[in-house]
Regions:
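Bacterial Sec-dependent N-terminal signal peptides
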Residues: 1-35
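A generic short-segment signal for beta-strand/edge and adjacent turn/coil regions
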Residues: 119-126, 139-143, 152-155, 176-180, ...
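Exposed, low-structure sequence patches enriched in small/polar residues
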Residues: 224, 258-308, 314-316, 380-689
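Membrane-interfacial, low-structure loops and terminal tails that flank and connect transmembrane helices
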Residues: 325, 352-383, 625-628
Length: 689
């Protein structure tokens, strides 16, 4: 333990040294101005009069980062919180989740499943093979788009262990804006776990690139990502007694020396994802005051423009002096007073005699009696001019025309170079890329979905208390599976659905959202999805008590891979009924006491799941034979009850966070869940001066 910590400290020192070196060299590079000299040679001009950066060292660069998520169907923006590097940061690399709510195989990036049923992702698409690796994938609805006043770079590396069982989690993110409307960025994610047991290594790579344009009339979001996921499969250790009762064995085994069921077996997933949403708004303009951040950014831009103009004037004077053969005095030019002067076209008033007759009193002029009154009027005019300078023209959208394109392309390959004798119960084909005891099962799937929507937006007038949308979607799906002759069987499915949304998100007291979608043609004809939520925020004891209700009714088609799958040892073609899933959930939240209570009831009819069975031929569990997997469907409904309490306590620098979850499943052989799940985190939090 001590040696591991010592190695990690050495690695941290190396990283810190590199960081300090980079920080120390940056000012040196900034002070070295490489430019074209008079001899047209590219060389440093350190010995010359080097001009300062146009930004100026005495001006503060605006800092600020806004992030938001979008609705996957309509692209509606929802403000989000920027990730911090303090609270719970040490848990971010863990496959088990921030609060240990996931079951996994223990290794970084290994397959996992959420123990809390109501927190599992409902719609993960058709490709079920990528679902257990959601630690590296990010749904569109959870991705953070960025808008930043200055470029932002964030690089993190979390590492532990050694060359045998070490784990590395690397992330690099860069975000920048081209103007206030266009934002873009990219991100690298790499997870590598060597594994504590034999044949347990994982390697996941993801590259993400995004862009957004937020204009008054036109708005767009683009998200592109590609993933490569690789996991070594060992089938578990051959005998649990290696861990439970190590004294039964004559030899002592290290973790990576314990025999496993499988060797040289790999599971690989590759995928490419493209999401594009854009809309055109029709509305009207109105004047509103800028935010403090916008005012700060505008002042910075004005100061930069003024300084750039001064630099341009100095450069012109320098060139003029060079052409005239004169010496240019930098100090004298900087001290030269600037006079506005009289305009060239100004008229000179003559000494004409005043009219003798009395002028008629104008009704359009304002009488100013005394200097104080004049000063007051001038101050008011100056204040009005300043107020006008910090006003902006806001475009209020009334109607939106929305289009969303979502494309996903997957490939999954299971490779085995050797398989234990009689390990599998069935063998459906021997032709293909590998023969003998080797396996090469490959399947491909791509899906393209287009959605068109027409929206009347909330809040464009005092009478528009809610937003209303109508949409139509077309979904095209393609699948490829091997056949018994070594070829490929191809399947195509299409679906057309229509629906609508009614929502209210503005205001403080009441919010609600209801969405309904009906399948009208194709494979998903007859499906129905109704989702809704409502929250009421009541002032209570000097704070806000939030009462939240949510629920849904889904009648959906089971995933293609529950209905059809072809592999060398697993094969099924099922005619499954539609899954009917109903949920009602209530949440009570009180920020003053840091308390939240959730209670949910689920009922699922025709639940689809995978069932595995095998034989154990001796007592030591080492000889497993007849392994088979089948997709099944539960005919009778499965009922689940979930009650969850969040309670945080803070007393001075002492913080204590607790989550207690109770779950009950009516059919544990179909949906097994732990009856009790407890999470507790006790820590000290204080400022460091």
């Amino acid at each position: 333990m001590y040696s591991t910590i010592q190695k990690m400290m050495k690695k941290s020192k190396v990283i810190l040294t590199i960081t300090l070196f980079c920080a120390a060299t940056s000012p040196v590079v900034a002070q070295t101005d490489f430019s074209n000299n008079e001899d047209s040679m590219f060389a440093p001009v350190n010995n010359r009069n080097v001009r300062t950066d146009s930004l100026g060292s005495d001006k503060e660069i605006p800092k600020g980062l806004k992030v938001w998520t979008i609705d996957e169907r309509f692209g509606d923006r929802q403000e989000a919180q920027v990730d911090t590097l303090q609270h719970m940061y040490m848990n971010t690399p863990f496959t088990s989740g921030l609060k240990g709510e996931y079951n996994s195989l223990g290794n970084l990036g290994s397959p996992r499943i959420n123990r809390i049923f109501i927190d599992r992702r409902l719609d993960q698409g058709q490709f079920i093979f990528a679902q257990p690796f959601d630690c590296i994938s990010t749904p569109v609805s959870e991705f953070h788009f960025t808008n930043t006043y200055s470029p932002i770079t964030n690089v993190t590396l979390n590492s532990c262990g050694n060359r045998t069982n070490g784990e590395d989690d690397f992330k690099a993110m860069f975000a920048v804006n081209a103007g206030k409307r266009l934002g873009m960025g990219f991100r690298f994610d790499y997870k590598y776990g060597r594994g504590y047991y034999d044949s347990q290594s994982t390697s996941h790579f993801k590259y993400t690139m995004w862009g957004s344009y937020i204009g008054d009339r036109y708005q767009a979001h683009l998200l592109f990502s590609t993933l490569h996921q690789k996991a070594t499969e060992n089938g578990g250790i051959t005998n649990d007694d290696y861990i439970k009762h190590p004294e039964l064995f004559e030899d002592t085994y290290a973790e990576n020396e314990i025999p496993t069921v499988l060797q040289q077996n790999w599971n690989r997933n590759n995928s490419v994802h493209v999401f594009f949403n854009h809309r055109y708004n029709v509305g009207f303009n109105r004047k509103v005051r800028m935010t403090d951040e916008e005012i700060k950014a505008k002042k910075f831009a004005m100061a930069s423009k003024k300084e750039n103009a001064a630099e341009d004037a100095k450069e012109e004077a320098r060139k003029k002096a060079r052409q005239e053969g004169k010496k240019f005095d930098e100090d004298a030019f900087g001290k030269t007073p600037k006079f506005a002067g009289r305009p060239d076209d100004a008229k000179i008033a003559g000494d004409e005699p005043a009219a003798d007759k009395k002028e008629a009193k104008s009704t359009e002029r304002i009488a100013v009696n005394g200097k104080s009154a004049a000063d007051s009027i001038m101050a008011q005019e100056k204040k009005a001019a300043q107020d006008t300078a910090w006003m902006k023209n806001e475009y209020v959208p009334v109607t939106s025309f929305i289009h969303t394109l979502k494309f996903d392309n997957y490939s999954r390959t299971y490779i085995a170079y050797q398989t234990p004798a009689d390990y599998y119960l069935n063998e459906y084909y021997t032709a293909g890329k590998y023969e003998g005891d080797s396996i090469y099962d490959n399947t491909k799937h791509w899906e393209m979905k287009n959605t068109l929507a027409l929206a009347t937006l909330e809040g464009f007038s005092k009478w528009a208390k809610a937003g209303l949308k109508a949409f139509v979607s077309y979904d095209l799906r393609h699948f490829e599976l091997p056949d018994t002759e070594g070829g490929v069987m191809k399947y195509n499915e299409h679906s057309v659905s229509v629906g609508g949304q009614l929502s209210k998100r503005q205001g403080k007291l009441l919010h609600y959202n209801a969405v309904a979608e009906i399948g009208v043609a194709g494979e998903d004809a007859g499906t129905l999805a109704v989702d809704g939520d409502v929250d009421v925020n009541i002032p209570f004891l000097g704070d806000t008590l939030s009462v939240i209700g949510s629920g849904f009714f889904h009648r959906i088609t089971p995933s293609f891979y529950f209905r059809n799958y072809h592999g060398r040892h697993f094969w099924w073609e099922n005619d499954l009924d539609k899954i009917i899933h109903t949920r009602i959930m209530g949440t009570l939240k009180f920020a003053k006491t840091k308390t939240m209570l959730r209670v949910a009831v689920d009922e699922i009819k025709n639940y689809a799941y995978l069932s595995q069975s095998y034989n154990v031929t001796d007592n030591n569990q080492s000889a497993r034979t007849g392994v088979t997997v089948q997709a099944k469907q539960s005919g009778s409904p499965v009922n689940l009850l979930t009650a969850q309490l969040f309670q945080d306590v803070r007393w001075g620098i002492l913080n204590w966070e607790n989550v207690i979850t109770y779950q009950h499943s009516s059919k544990t052989d179909v949906i097994p869940v732990p009856a009790l799940n407890v999470y507790s985190n006790l820590y000290l939090k204080f400022p460091v001066v």
